[in-house]
Each structure stands twice: as C-alpha cells, then as structure tokens.
Amino acid sequence: MSSEKECLENMLNGYAESGRVLSRTSLVINQAVNRSIFTSTVSPAAERIRFILGEEDDSPAPPQLFTELDELLAVDGQEMEWKETARWIKFEEKVEQGGERWSKPHVATLSLHSLFELRTCIEKGTILLDLEATSLPQIVEIVINNQIELGLLKADMKENVTRTLLRKHRHQTKKSNLRSLADIGKTVSSASRLFSTPDNGSPTMTHRNLTSTSLNDVSDKPDKEQLKNKFMKKLPRDAEASNVLVGEVDFLESPFIAFVRLQQAVMLGSLTEVPVPTRFLFILLGPKGKAKSYHEIGRSIATLMSDEVFHDIAYKAKNREDLIAGIDEFLDEVIVLPLGEWDPTIRIEPPKSLPSSDKRKNMYSGGDNLQMNGDAPHDDGGGGHGDSEELQRTGRFCGGLIKDIQRKAPFFASDFYDALSIQSLSAILFIYLGTVTNAITFGGLLGDATENMQGVLESFLGTAVSGAVFCLFGGQPLTILSSTGPVLVFERLLFNFSKDNDFDYLEFRLWIGLWSAFQCLILVATDASFLVKYFTRFTEEGFSSLISFIFIYDAFKKMIKLADYYPINSHFKVDYITQYSCACFPPEPANSSWFNMTTAATTTQFLTNASTDMAYNGTIDWSLLSKKECLKYGGLLVGSNCKYVPDITLMSFILFLGTYTCSMALKKFKTSRYFPTTARKLISDFAIILSILIFCGLDALLGVDTPKLIVPSEFKPTSPNRGWFVPPFGGNPWWVYLAAAIPALLVTILIFMDQQITGVIVNRKEHKLKKGAGYHLDLFWVAILMVVCSFMALPWYVAATVISIAHIDSLKMETETSAPGEQPKFLGVREQRVTGTVVFLLTGLSVFMAPILKFIPMPVLYGVFLYMGVASLNGVQFMDRLKLLLMPPKYQPDFIYLRHVPLRRVHLFTFLQVVCLAMLWILKSTVAAIIFPVMILALVAVRKAMDYFFSQHDLSFLDDVIPEKDKKKKEDEKKKKKKKGSIDSDVEDSDCPYPEKVPSIKIPMDIMEKEPFLIDSKPSDRENSPTFLERHTSC
C-alpha cells in the first residue's frame, strides 16, 4: 500500500513540475475521470483530486465558509474604500443598486470566460498556503514581499499597494424599520444610486446603510456592529471566513494577484461583515478599465469557495497545482446556458432540495457508494432493512433480546436529557390529546361490546400503565401504544362466545392473554423478529395506508353520526316562528296532567321554582319537563318544533374542518414568508395545540351547545360486577384454561404483526434514528404488559401506527443555521423517553382533570383525528403513485422511479397495491376481521409472488428487494466487479458500460494566451488569430 502511495506521489510531483508548461498550452478539463472518447488514460488532474480527497485524515471535516466580496470603490465621491458588494454561504446575495437592502439569495450565474481567467490568476499569482500570520498588515506585508522577490511587483509600488489594501472597509448592514427623522433626512439627501457608472467605468457608492471601519489601527477584535449582526444566526459556530478583495487602481501596469490560506483562522478586526475568523484571502488589484472583469473574477472565486468539493480541495491543497485541479473539476461539472435562450440578468431561485455533493466526492475518494457499470441495486436511503443489525438472527437463546439491551443501555441516560427542548412540550400536548381521544373512543366502543366489563376508565388506566412502562423501558420509546381495531373485534367476539357458552368472560380472557404472552416470549427467545426483514415497502405502506384511511373514515363517520343525533331542520322558516311550538304530554292522555313526584324524585332533581312549589302536592306539571326528562319518563313530544336543533351540526362541522385546516396551515407555517424564523418554528411546533385552543375559544364565544369531551370523574371499575383483579381459577372448567391457547395463537399473530410492522415504519432509514431499534425488546415488554392487563381486566395494547408516526413528525429536528436560500436540512428525530412517558402519565391523570377537559368539543378532537390520518400519508410513495393515475405524463413529477421504470409497470404495481388494500378494507369491515393479522401476513406472500411479474430492477425502485440467502455471496461478486469496473458519475442514467480505462480531454488555450492578460487588446488582433479548428484540423 505504501509503495502505491509513493508511486502516486512521484507521479503527482512530476505533474507539478510540468504543470505550468502544460497549463499554458492547454486547459485540462477532467471528464469525471472517464468521460473522454479519445484517450484511455486517467488525467493527472483527476488523479490529483482523487489523491487529495481520498487521503486518510483523522482531522474533523472542514468548517462552513462565509465568503465576502469587497470591491475598491469611491464612496460619495470621497476616498477609495473597500465596499462589501456580495456575500455567499451557499447562494449569492448582492447589495441591490439602491444600496438599501440585500437581494434575495439566488444561484450565482458565472461567465465561462471569468472562470478561465480565474484559473490563469491562480496559475500566475502568488499562492501562499498555511501562512502563519495574526493580522492583516502582517499578511499584506508577506504577500507584497513575496511578489517583489518573484519579480511580479516593483519595489517602489510596495507603499501604494499596502496603503490600498489597508483602506477602510464598509459593510452592508440592516437597520430597523423605525428610523429617526435624522436618518430619513440623510437617506433623502444622498439619493445617488449604488452602482452609477461614470465615464471611466468605475462604480461609485452611496453612503446609506454602510458601516465604515479603518484597519489602520490594526484592531483584531470585532466591533460592535459585527457583534450585533443578526446574520450570525445563519452561520454554524465553527464557521470561518473567506475574503475576496478586488479592485482597479491607477498605479499598476499588470495585475496584483494573491491567494492566501492561513495556518490558523484569525480574527482580522472588522475585515468581515460578521465576527468570524478569516481562513482564506483572495486579492486581485489591476489596472484601470477592467472593473467588470475584476468583479466577475471575484464572483467566480467566491462561488467556488461556496462549492462543497472545491471548498474541501482548498482546505487540503498542498500546492498551486492542487488548486488548479480543483478549478478544472469545477469546470468539468459546470453547466453552460446558451446566451440566446437565457437572460443572465434573471436571478435563479434556489432549488428546494440541493443535489448531494457526495457523488462527486466519492468519485474521487474511492467511496463504496459508487455504482459500477449500472449493476448495483437502487437505494434511495429509505430502502429495505434486511441488512439492519437489529434484525440479524443470533441463533442463541434470547440472543436478539440481549443485543437489544446492550444496544439501548448506553443511551438510557441521554434518553432523558435529550428531551430538554420546547419542541418536546408541543409534542406532549399534541400526542396527549390524540391519546385521550383514542382512549375515550375505544373505551366507549369496548364498553358497548362487553356490556361495560371494560369501559372508558379501564381504557384510561390501561393506556397510562402500558404506555408509561413501555416508553420507559421499551426498545423504541418513540412508539406509542394504543388499542386497535382488530383487538376490539376480537374482544367483541370473545365476549359473545363466553356469553353464549356460560363462560366467565374475564377469566377466559385472562388465560388467553397469558397464553398469548407466553407465545410472544417464545418468539422473543427465538429471535423471530428477524422475519421483519421480509416486510418490504409494499407491506409497510399497505398497512400504514390502511390505518390512515381508517382514521380518516372514522373521523367523518363520527361527524355523520353526530349529525344524525342533532339533525338539521331544513324546513324551518324564520317567518313562521310564531307557529312553531313543542310541548310534553303524559304517556297516557286519559290520565291527569299531573305526575307522581316520588318516582321522579328518586332519579332527578328539578331546578325550576314551579316544581318546588308543587312538590308539596307530590306532583309536577309535564309541561315543565325538559326534552330529555320528558323522553326519559315516557312522555310524548308534540309540536312542529320538537325536532329542531339550533346550529349544532353546522357548528360541529365548522369546528371539525376548521381544526383540521388550521392544523395543516400552521404546521406548514415554518416555510412561509411571514414573521422571523424563530416565530415561524414555534408556531409550527405548536400548530395542533394552537388550532385546538382557537376553536375551543370559538366554541365558547358562540355558546352553541356542541357535544363535549366526557371523562370519567370517579376512579372505579365501569361495571359494579367486577374488581381490579381477575382470579385465574374457579370461574370456568379446567379444560378451558388449556383450550385458551388456540384463540391465543390468533392474538399472538395480531400482536406480532401490529407491533413489528409499526416498529419497522418507525425505524425506517429516512427518519435518521441514531440510537438503534429494539424489535425483540419491544415485543418482550408488550408480552409482559399483556400479562398485567389480563390480570387487571384492562384492554390489551400494541403499537399504534398513525399516532406513532404523528409522534415522530412532532419531534423532527432540522438545522438551526441554514444558509440564506437553503431549505433547512432534516437532521433526524429527537429520540428520548420523556414525551411518551409524560403523555401516558397525563392520560392516567385525566380522570382528575375532568373539570378542564369537559370544555373541549368532540368535533375539535375529531378534526385532530382527521389531521393525524392525512398527515401520516405524507411522503408515502403509494400515495404519490396513486396521484400519477390522474396526471398526464408531461405533468408528472420527476420521481426517480419514473426515470427507470416504464409507466405502465408503475401503474400495474399501484393497481395490485390498491386491490390488496381494498380486500383488507372489506375484510376488516366484516365479522372475519378477526383474521385481519393473518391477511397482513398474506401481503408478504403477495409481494413475494411479484418477483415473477416484475424484474428485480423495477422492484428495486418501486419497492425494497427481498433479502436472499446468498446475498453475501452476490455482494462479494459485486465487489470483485467494482475492482475491475470503471467509475462514472452518470452511470446511473445510462445502461451502457464505459471503457475500463479513464481518459481526459485537453482543450488548447492558445486563444487565451494570444490575448494579453487582463489588459486591453484590439479587436483586430483577435480577429486575425487562428481559430481552434484552423489550428487543430487533425481533430
């Protein structure tokens, strides 16, 4: 290995020695290492870049650069000063011509000629790498002395150049909108434009919004204006500066060029707009008359410094040739737009997602992520999980469980202090309301299905106990446990079976729970969770989409049921209000209109004065009863107005749809243009809570009697016929205890499928979880909690897909310092145990918060249900493909799979997924819903059968490739091919293999050498010079 490295270094040194001669006759453009069609050798520049970027280095990655372009300009007709005219982090921002503001960030458009001239500047100028200096005067002194020694600058020019480089610096700063009258007066008095071009072509500057500082006092500390600059929020803490100084002077006959990289980044006073240390300096001073050329060269070097690949090369370069090779690489990747088809003055908006530079870097650093000859499978980062460490079968007793514990134990402490964020509070409130609503809904349905043997209070207690324990000790604390539809169906069938056969329902259920928990523990001990690797995107998206559709369907179903209970009287007419009436009459018209008070007194208390007066006679007038009381005691409502319900349904739908719409709008508020970034992020984090508060307030303000949240106010079992502990023996024959193992097997399949599919969805690669999964540990705790819930006659709990996805979405983290114009990058999810634990503790305490919770309208919570269902469908590929069915091909988005898979195959795949989803929906809506988990398992078989209808190439883009037994063998073969294959950055877009050798293209630069560098040349000279084809007819 060392001999190969020495060989490469010798070759690079040979290139360095001949670099100047070569560069003066030709421009080597690296064609992504192997693009040339004329030669089969690797270009020296490409080898150089590969050596630079592929070098093993234990030092941290180079920091982010802030690049500032300062130009030498006359301000208000006064002395020449350095004026900041543009800046870069990722995108270019210019000072607008009015001088009042910065432009919007935009993609820097450069002229190809300025890039060529920049390359020549690096060739001919002074290059000082790893210079040890602590101040700007010291840097300037070293640079000037170096130029004098090399004969590039006359000694008598030293004083003039030094004085020019140490002139005042003015930075563009933002001022408050609330300015004083004096400031306004100054602005009016200096109405000249920022770039007004006089006869000599030298721009002059206005005096507005400028901060001026002289560096003659050699102050290395940032001034107050720098420290107050809010632009620092856009930069990471370890950011460094790259300063570009360009301008024209009247005392130079040839350009003064220098590129400096300091050994250590140094604070150079107020040289930079923001108080960050300077690492790079590029200086270009030239004769008068070419200010525009200097400006464009300055923009070119500044843009290169913001390019990730050249940025790394600039930090690692060891000599001039390394920098030239970096420019050549940039020129190879640059795109040229025809002048007649594009206006260069148009500012290109930054893209929503930036292309990754990893492909360019790996192309030279020899990364493992390269595709060779197009035979590597597709992986877009969200692919399969067959190679996941958590799903490797150990072959030992409880081996997977032990590994899960070892993997999660080091993070246990951090799982608590990582929750210290305001975002955690918003997640707690959001998930709490969703969990409470879910507990009440399923508790009510469970009470109806089991004649209140399990009800709302049991649902609250079971949710609190199971959820809190799981979040504290489970393998994936981001997973939220809840009751599910299949469990509810099983409970209903089990209760009816027990009732028909005179079995003790709770005892029978206890034994089923014990058997199921035992079977789950067997699955844990045998590492059965490795089967999860066969759950591909097809299965996961089918399951998650179905649950999301159920949430959406149930939300509308509940609202329609509410509309039936509070019907709209469409025949009501305001003009006929005098004719509308409603009265309560006794059940038997033959009797007196008086009713025995003693019957009523045992069940209700009348609050009217009239009833109190009549209590002495022991009777009450029927006409004084309310509608509910009248119906309760068998009375008759007579009148045309008895069915009129004022505005409840309409108001409920307003609250329902309003909560959903407001939640969606506020959640997207983070990317809006209103308010500062911090305010937008805060509003987005608390979107659901704000929506609930807004519409709860609206409901209270209007005073319409909409149905409210009903929470149990007493801590006791719903049914008086049961306690908090179920005795295991005595209620059923002995053989029932053994027979319970058969239905328990069905429950085990249900629990295993629900838990593991939700776990797979939560742990997908696109969520960027860093603390690892714990499939075996999750199933272990679900089994233990099933035992506890069975003994306490509480509902069984398993991972809830939609609420878990909502929990993850509420904890997503993005970069706090994103460059202007750059979309915040998704960093991952705030992995911790606090939010889930607090949510479930609050759920248990909700019994004592009934006086507060009773003010929340149910339609508002149904709106939250709708939001959770719709939000969990975002980013699901199945939904994207479903929309393609309604789009003409020319309007379809540029999805990666549409580039590689024929559209008819995409539609066929979607159609099969829709058919499977429809069958699952029909199944869950019938009595056969008890075998729902088995049908989910059948999706894996359906996906396996697709291998006979779709090629592996198509499935690699539309789905995940199912793991194979001989995968390791195939990977070894692939690595052998990689050693023999060629590297191509565009191989993924082409099915044609490229030559094995790596060529280069050399474009002669004689035309540019014929022109004097950066000084006037006559048009006639250029016209008489031979063209490229004339001098190279052999080509």
UniProtKB/Swiss-Prot annotation:
Expressed in kidney and to a lower extent in bladder, brain, intestine, large intestine and eye. The chain crosses the membrane at residues 422-446, 457-475, 477-497, 506-526, 541-564, 649-666, 682-701, 736-763, 776-792, 794-811, 834-850, 858-874. Keywords: Cell membrane, Glycoprotein, Ion transport, Membrane, Sodium, Sodium transport, Symport, Transmembrane, Transmembrane helix, Transport. It catalyses: 2 hydrogencarbonate(out) + Na(+)(out) = 2 hydrogencarbonate(in) + Na(+)(in); 3 hydrogencarbonate(out) + Na(+)(out) = 3 hydrogencarbonate(in) + Na(+)(in). Residues 192-217 have a biased composition (Polar residues). NCBIfam families: ae. This is Electrogenic sodium bicarbonate cotransporter 1. It comes from Ambystoma tigrinum. The lineage of its organism: Eukaryota, Metazoa, Chordata, Craniata, Vertebrata. The gene is SLC4A4.
